[in-house]
Amino acid sequence: MKYVLICEDKKDSLEVRLSNRDKHLAYIGELGDRISMAGPMLSDDGERMVGSVLIIEADSAADIQAIANSDPYALAGLFEKVTIRPFRQVIPGA
């Protein structure tokens, strides 16, 4: 099943995000084709990264939570809130 992982950054934490970005991207890259989509959420003006959204194939929400917990961003204390929801892809057809 696919899950959407929404990670909201703590306020004024851009430096934490930027200093851990390379480690985060390497970690996410290790998930390979389990990742359908990933990228940063942006501020309302589109200028700053304020979180992350990923769509990931996994057996359970617990698996997604484990992925989120091991992310270098999470280990650095970047996230204020993490939300995991089952996701059904309709377009393009899955």
Model-derived segments and their meaning:
Residues M1-A94:
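Conserved, structured core segments of small domains
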